[in-house]
Amino acid sequence: LYAPDVPVIGGGLFTKEYAEEHRAELERVYSMLADEKSKQVFDGWLEYRITGRIHPLLRNQTDKAEGYEILDLGGNETYADLGAYNGDTITEFLEVTGGQFNKIFAMEPDGKNYSKMKRIHYKLSPYDFRTVNAGAWSCDTVCEFISKGGRNSSLIPYEKGKPVNPSRIKEIEMRSLDSFVKDERITYIKYDVEGSESEA
């Protein structure tokens, strides 16, 4: 089974030649890994990126519980969920921390998803659970957005060249994480920011 790796943003493919050109950076990242499991996962990821074979990813697969175990989240986390969708990862976070946390900051640009998230987590205090119907960016601005009311909503550049229903294009507020959280110290961040990966 092959699953070629294609970039979500920007151009260029991750090939053997690319890996050779960036050998120093890749070796630097590898040297920062603290344990053998992390190094094994990195090697598998690198093999997948170059070959397109999915097996190197599958042999390093773990369940979500192990990931949360590694993160070692406690009851005093300040969590930023950028691209919060309907609040599904907020629900996971609350399960992992036993409902204990300092604050949660959630950004979601799609209006329907944002409403679902607010409805699902209506019991959380507005002081502890701060939300904004906006996308993540490097500064506060406005961008064009394709609203699809699901996981496929994205910024316009992500869809370039594909036919788009003009009624789905909306101008949306974009916020920087710093302007949204002010002086809060974030201890855990989740990014799922379709089309604004390099800017967020």
Per-range role (PLM):
Residues 1-200:
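Phosphate/nucleotide-binding beta-alpha loop and adjacent structural elements of enzyme active sites
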